[in-house]
Amino acid sequence: MIVEEAAEILEGQLVAVIPPSVQHLIMIGDHKQLRPIVHFIRLKKRHHLDVSMFERLVNCELPFRQLRYQCRMRDEFVDLLRELKLYEELKTNDKVIA
């Protein structure tokens, strides 16, 4: 099963749609960007509902792969992201025209 934008999905919603027959779960997303939207502030704070299952697994240091080469941004943006220590390993693909 492949889950796109996994960092934006509430953990309960994700668990609810995983059928018992699933042998592999591939989650794609960016845990450093958008988080799940929770409208009940008290529940969100008390139970950390704004942290997705994807982010929890990354924070628990389970094995994951991170994008190393990007093909959409200008080099200046990539340099800024590295300076801010958000994506220190990120590089621009040689074929990017900017």
Where are these regions (language model features)?
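Conserved helicase motor core of SF1/SF2 NTP-dependent helicases
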Residues: 1-98
